[in-house]
């Protein structure tokens, strides 16, 4: 029976390690803090590395994360074309299987748990036989057959939405909802907050937004409309807005450049870029409210759940958002539009909440939001996962 301490854990991630943290990065760090030896496998570098003599050669590098002694980062360059993934998946898997054998040899110690967040199915779980315990943990909306096939061989499946779990109903592995977590940097250390300090001092309200601004699934017209029609509100944005800042991808097309330029031109917008978690938490603590504005029809999460929600809730301040199914019956936690196909009413909802901010941020509501967030700390989520694994034995 696996426990989630004193183990060697290999995490398969579709996003590289970097400044911006998603669920897989937070779980890796929390598992390391709990006494596990964690190896975080970055997705492969594109294109084969070649020596001076010409033939392709694999490059596998394992090094310290720099933030915890138990957390190691694995970078690797393929010895075969990555494009095989899109044209000849069996050949790609043949090459990746040999690559994985070399990675495991480089690690040099037995793996107890493989924890996969990999919707691309780059490294199928069926490659890892007993006694390795295999966890499949999709936190993004699966699209395409490989995303579904990635669950094959899992001993247990966790996800942040019930909609995602439903898509894996064909697999016999037990399936459980585990909400997004929150890292220690965002957990309150003092007393519960009071009313907005900006309201007390007669200063402009500040509304926070976090996430990759390069994403094409943002509802850009609605967001620009909200900012332009609320000139007395300061909008502070954290997250990548240039390609070099992002470790989690994003568009570089002319529409994206035009959107970023429009934000930069607005006098009530501040773009902070990607920052470490501690700095992000400090910035959030200054906010009076938070805004989420995705186009559900394009949204990679399908408007079901977002990691940032838990971090916003940790401040106690109100969230104004497009429709999010996970929180549809929790009006104290979030103020959202009812529609699933458009955000036409989001600007009006934003104005209503801002005009009545003292009501939406009364102490009782703030306390409920903070307590909900604290109950979903990553340490608590790992405890829940460990118990669910134990209960299956």
What are these regions (language model features)?
Residues 194, 341, 358-391:
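A charged, aromatic-enriched C-terminal amphipathic alpha-helix characteristic of glycosyltransferases
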Residues 199-218, 223-228, 235-238, 374:
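Conserved donor-binding/catalytic core segment of Leloir-type glycosyltransferases
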Residues 35, 288, 316-317:
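A short alpha->beta transition loop at the rim of the catalytic pocket in nucleotide-sugar-dependent
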Residues 145-148, 182-203:
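Acidic anion/phosphate-binding donor-loop and adjacent secondary structure
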Residues 163, 181:
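Carbohydrate-associated surface elements
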Residues 18-22, 278-283, 290-313, 320-331:
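Nucleotide-sugar-dependent
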Residues 239, 248-281:
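Nucleotide-activated donor-binding/catalytic signature segment of Leloir-type glycosyltransferases, i.e.
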């Amino acid at each position: 029976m696996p426990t989630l301490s004193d183990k060697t854990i290999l995490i398969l991630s579709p996003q590289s390690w970097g400044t911006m943290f998603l669920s897989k990065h937070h779980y890796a760090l929390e598992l390391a803090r709990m006494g596990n030896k964690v190896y975080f496998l970055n997705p492969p570098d594109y294109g084969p590395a070649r020596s001076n003599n010409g033939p392709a050669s694999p490059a596998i590098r394992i090094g310290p994360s720099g933030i915890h002694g138990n957390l190691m980062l694995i970078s690797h360059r393929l010895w075969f074309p990555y494009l095989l993934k899109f044209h000849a998946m069996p050949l790609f898997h043949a090459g990746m299987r040999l690559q994985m054998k070399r990675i495991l040899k480089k690690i040099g110690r037995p793996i107890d748990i493989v924890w996969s967040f990999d919707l691309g199915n780059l490294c199928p779980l069926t490659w890892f036989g007993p006694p390795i315990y295999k966890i499949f943990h999709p936190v993004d909306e699966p699209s395409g057959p490989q995303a579904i096939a990635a669950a094959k061989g899992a001993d247990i499946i966790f996800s942040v939405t019930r909609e995602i779990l439903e898509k894996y109903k064909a697999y016999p592995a037990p399936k459980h909802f585990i909400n997004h977590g929150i890292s220690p940097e965002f957990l309150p250390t003092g007393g519960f907050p009071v009313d907005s300090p900006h309201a007390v001092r007669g200063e402009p309200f500040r509304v926070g937004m976090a996430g990759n601004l390069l994403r094409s699934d943002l509802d850009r017209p609605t967001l620009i409309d909200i900012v332009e029609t609320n000139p007395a509100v300061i909008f502070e944005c954290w997250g990548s807005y240039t390609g070099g800042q992002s470790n989690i991808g994003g568009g570089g097309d002319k529409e994206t450049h035009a959107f970023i330029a429009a934000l930069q031109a607005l006098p009530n917008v501040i773009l902070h870029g990607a920052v470490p978690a501690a700095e992000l938490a400090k910035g959030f603590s200054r906010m009076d409210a938070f805004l989420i504005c995705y186009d559900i029809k394009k949204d990679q999460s399908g408007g079901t759940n977002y990691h940032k929600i838990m971090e916003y809730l940790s401040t106690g301040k109100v969230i104004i958002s497009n429709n999010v199914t996970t929180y549809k019956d929790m009006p104290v936690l979030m103020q959202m539009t009812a529609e699933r196909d458009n955000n036409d009413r989001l600007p009006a909802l934003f104005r209503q909440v801002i005009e009545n901010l003292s009501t939406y941020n009364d102490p009782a509501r703030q306390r409920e939001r903070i307590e909900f967030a604290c109950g979903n700390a990553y340490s608590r989520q790992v405890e829940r996962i460990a118990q669910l694994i134990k209960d299956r034995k």
